[in-house]
Amino acid sequence: MNINLAISQGSKILRNKFIPNSQLDSEILMAKTINKDRKYILLNSNNILNNNDLNNFYELIEKRSLGNPVAYLTNKKFLWNWYRHK
């Protein structure tokens, strides 16, 4: 599965659980999963994910769908276009 499709599916899962900003959250969790920034995610959306990364991504999506904050899941606090480590 490629990055774009995984993000879309993750966003749909979050949206169905009424999580606000589901697309952004899905992108941030993907970036955390593959240890890249959002710019890389957007520019390389057709790259294929390995099974380990895909499973880790869906674990984060599941935790987010249960209400865990993105900052807690990523250990980063995102503020506009930059972040700081907690």
What are these regions (language model features)?
Residues 1-34, 40-42, 46-49:
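Non-catalytic accessory regions of SAM-dependent methyltransferases
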